[in-house]
Amino acid sequence: GGGPGGWGCAIAEVPYIYYKMYGDESVLADFLPQVLRYFDYLEAHSENDLVVSDQKNEWCLGDWCTPEEIVIPEPFVNNYFYIRTINRLLEFCRVLNRNDLVPELTALAERKKAAIVRTYFDAQTGDFCRNVQGANAFAVDLGLGDDRTFANMVRHYEQNTWFDTGIFGTDIVTRVLFERGHATLAYRLLTSEEKYSFWHWQSTGCTTFPEYWTYNRSQNHPMFGAVIKYLFRFILGITQEGAGWKNIVIAPKFADGLNSAEGSILTESGRVSVRFVRSAGRVSFRIEIPEGVQARLAYAGSHPLTAGVHEFSLPEETTAR
């Protein structure tokens, strides 16, 4: 892989996503001891509680393929992924009832967070790593910083509506904005027509994603495609509680300038489809739910959904930012 964080931590992320998609707990049990061993590896490549190296003569990348020179520090990014993976393993423990591991893992995560704050947080500004290349989004995603941290991040992207981030920061910035009530800004970044944008690729004739914002090297590389899932998770609002798509929640986050959308995903339980049209202060929904699941529409209240097709017309909530 390319580094100990964004690449190596797939050892936990892949089985976790498999569990979420299919509800199969056995994959978590299979990988839990392997992830613990990987944590030993990360500890052996850490200094002052920051991951600083990989195997000798191997890459130790942090974020990758930023449009301009990479300045976000590699140990900051790798510790972010270490902490996020500890949190994933805590989810393993919850599902598998491995409460014996929780105190040690919780303490480990707190140590790693403290190292990030100690090394990279500026108490005068509220920024991490000077808020470069999405750094504040990494911190906010871990619950670090203060109110200024997120506010400074939002201000930066309101003033610079293009991605200055690499393959990880692009994903994290977009998700953090959607999750924290700034769907419109996330949508503006996704549809930006500035120099480093998905539109710019399209405008120059690309039919696949290049490896770099600047078109270097491969012209068919999937790694910037992580944000595509947010079209379904946030814009259409197709989410789930639990695992295996047995408890479906439709919770769209509307963005100014986007008045209609339609799409579907094929889950372990069957196809889930959503269409919405916003007009004259109301939202018309058409939602299809598969058999054998619980489901609800979480918009303007909570509306139970049984198997089949449902059509709603609801007053629009004034929450888009």
Report each predicted region and the residues it spans:
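Carbohydrate-binding/catalytic loop surfaces
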Residues: G1-G6, A10, Y22, V51-V77, ...
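Active-site acid/base region of carbohydrate-active enzymes
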Residues: G6-C9, E13, M21-Y80, C93-F138, ...
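Well-ordered alpha-helical scaffold segments within catalytic/enzyme domains
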Residues: I11-V27, F81-N99, A137-D147, D171-R180, ...
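Long, well-ordered core segments of solenoidal/helical folds
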Residues: F31-V51, A107-T125, L144-F163, G181-W201
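Generic beta-strand/beta-sheet core signal
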Residues: H45, D54, N131, L177, ...
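Alpha-solenoid helical repeat architecture
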Residues: D164-D171
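Non-catalytic C-terminal accessory modules of carbohydrate-active enzymes
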Residues: T184-R321
